[in-house]
Structures are given as structure tokens and as C-alpha cells.
């Protein structure tokens, strides 16, 4: 058994950058049978973060799963990041996780102690979330992969969908972008220690705390920023909600080092497919540096929440977020009536 191989060198892509591109997904999902059930609150149609099924007037189940390849070489840290990413979908729907189950793909050439550390990292994040880890499933694979299937709960009338953004709302982003670029640098072993530590801190932080800061405020819609990049998820929110969204490019928080690395051309392949998928739906209203534009399409791993909130509650939201440990949050846009383009970047 080889204990010295770097986990990130055993995979083609790292983290959420390993997802199939949005164009491919659209092709394979387009002719699946449509599900009609009066209790299905959120299903496939709006490309949301999780499914929501009404059990009774006071409770709905949230169901989601997520897994990916290593973004770091330390197995415990990888487990933490993968679990935080999986749990995020429940918070993005306005709910709380109840139970979690491990999803594991693991090469037989690696020491089982490595898998033990991955699972410990995941278990500690599940414990932090307040959910229960109740089982899982493993298969042998050439590339290591790890994540969770999560069941959560939410009140049926308090679901945060990605398709219900309200005209006049403002958008808050609760974590910086640029994680795909940093993960590419980490995989290539060119990230500095400061860049590595910064990326790990952002990716391993649960979105639980941002959710709790906002859960009692007037939120109309929410999604988490992952593999389709910041603008990709903004587009999904605009399209699903029948609105246009204006993004303040200079207000989008960037993780330290991301702009410099992007300027050097350290860009994950997923950025290009993300941009190709929606570039005809995005209008740049002014010149933007190439590196900044790339970062707006950069596939994120365990990114932040993008929250549509009323102007009335915006001050309370910002104050509440300022009271929690945060990696950086910002007002990044506003919701407009539907116009010629889904997304306007200024």
C-alpha cells in the first residue's frame, strides 16, 4: 500500500471542479420524466440545491447528496471540506440537517488509515452541524471520492428556493470566491502556505452560521455557490425567478491570492465551461479585468450562500453576519424586473 501518494495527484479534477459541465447536465436531464406530486415543493425543474417534500403542514423533508474528489492532500481536512460542502445544500434551502450517510469511493492502493481520517473529518463536521451520522456506502475506485447524503427538515412555508428572488431585493454573498483557482494552485503545488490556509478555512466553514444569522429575516431566495461558479448560480436564480439580477463586480469578495493566481493563468477547466454555458445571458455593462471576470465564473468548492433579502431587512442581515466568525461577506447585487439579459455585471 502506498501511503506517500498525494491525494490531489490521484484525480483529474479537484472538488466541485470535477462536476459535469452545465451544458452536459442539461442534455442528460432534459427528457427525464417530469414528476407531478402535490407534496413535492422543490424538484428537478429549477436546478435547486436539494429536493423538498412536504410531510405535513408543519414539516417538509430536505433531501440532498454531494461528493467530490480531494481538494487537499490531508485526509482529515479533505473529509471536513467535503462534509461542509454536502451540508451546505440543506442550509441553502432554509433548513436544518437531521441525518447524514457517508458516500465513499476509495482506491485499494491506499492505506485504510487514510480513509479512517477522511471519515473522521467528515464525522466531526456532521457533529458540529448537529446532525447524526447514521451509515454509508463504499465502493472501490481508482480515484478517491467522499461526500454525504443528507436528510434535513424545514417548515413548508419557510423554504428558501433558488427560484423565488423578489424584485427590489438585495443579494448578499457570505463567502469569498476564487476557491477553484486556489484549489488548482494547491493541486499543482504552487500555492503558498497562506493561500492554502486561507482556502481551507473558507471551505471547511459550515454555512450553518450564516443561515442562523439570516433565518428569521425576510429572505425570498437562496442558493449556495458551488461548481457552476458565482455567475452560474446567479443566472439560475434569475432564470428560475423570472427576474434580472444586477451584480456589483467590485463588491464580490475575493479570497486572498485568487486574483494574482488568475492573472497568472491558474484557471480550472470548469471556468471555461461555466462561462460558455451562460455568456449569452450575461451583459457586462463596463470593462472588467479578465482575471476578475474569470473569478466570477470560477467553480467553487464549499462556497458561500447567495441570499436575496428585502431592503428593509438588509441592515439587520449585515449586522447579524458581522457578529459571527466570517471569511468575508458583502452586498453583491440587487434583483430587477426581467429585462433583455438575465444577469447584468457592472
UniProtKB/Swiss-Prot annotation:
Mg(2+) binds at residues 49, 89, 224. GO terms for cellular component: cytoplasm. It comes from the Bacteria. It is an enzyme of class 2 (transferase). The active site is at 16. Its EC number is 2.7.9.3. GO terms for biological process: selenocysteine biosynthetic process. ATP binds at residues 19, 46-48, 66, 89, 136-138. Its cofactor is Mg(2+). Disulfide bonds: none annotated. One of its GO terms (molecular function) is selenide, water dikinase activity. It catalyses: hydrogenselenide + ATP + H2O = selenophosphate + AMP + phosphate + 2 H(+). The record marks 19 as: Important for catalytic activity. Homodimer. Belongs to the selenophosphate synthase 1 family. Class I subfamily. Synthesizes selenophosphate from selenide and ATP. HAMAP family: SelD. NCBIfam families: PRK00943.1 (NF002098), selD (TIGR00476). PANTHER family: INACTIVE SELENIDE, WATER DIKINASE-LIKE PROTEIN-RELATED (PTHR10256:SF0), SELENIDE, WATER DIKINASE (PTHR10256). This is Selenide, water dikinase. The gene is selD.
